[in-house]
């Protein structure tokens, strides 16, 4: 019985190691295949950043919540007036 368990565990470990070794390799630029080159890392990170910025700009125009800037400025003004009011109270 114990011999069959050892064989089963061995087969499972072998199968898992083969599956891991044959898995698809993805590089830093999220492009399949290729080796990871330290010289190209900066370029791939810049490419990802540019893609994220372009996606963010597209979503800002389409997003219904893009009108939050007036709310944010109103909140800042309210906080500033509260801070000024607290400062005046402390002076008295």
From Swiss-Prot:
PROSITE patterns: GNRH. The keyword Secreted applies. Residues 1-23 form the signal peptide. One of its GO terms (biological process) is luteinizing hormone secretion. The modification Pyrrolidone carboxylic acid is found at residue 24. GO terms for molecular function: gonadotropin hormone-releasing hormone activity; gonadotropin-releasing hormone receptor binding. Its main location: secreted. InterPro entries: GnRH, Gonadoliberin, Gonadoliberin_I_precursor. It comes from Gallus gallus. This is Progonadoliberin-1. Keywords: Amidation, Cleavage on pair of basic residues, Hormone, Pyrrolidone carboxylic acid, Secreted, Signal. Stimulates the secretion of gonadotropins. The modification Glycine amide is found at residue 33. It is found in: Secreted. GO terms for cellular component: axon; extracellular region; extracellular space; perikaryon. Belongs to the GnRH family. Disulfide bonds: none annotated.
């Amino acid at each position: 019985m114990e011999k069959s368990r050892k064989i089963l565990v061995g087969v499972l470990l072998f199968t898992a190691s083969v599956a891991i070794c044959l898995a698809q390799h993805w590089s830093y630029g999220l492009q399949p295949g290729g080796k990871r080159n330290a010289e190209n890392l900066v370029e791939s990170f810049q490419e990802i950043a540019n893609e994220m910025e372009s996606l963010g700009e597209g979503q800002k125009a389409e997003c219904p919540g893009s009108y939050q800037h007036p709310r944010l400025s109103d909140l800042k003004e309210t906080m500033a007036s509260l801070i000024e009011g607290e400062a005046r109270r402390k002076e008295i």
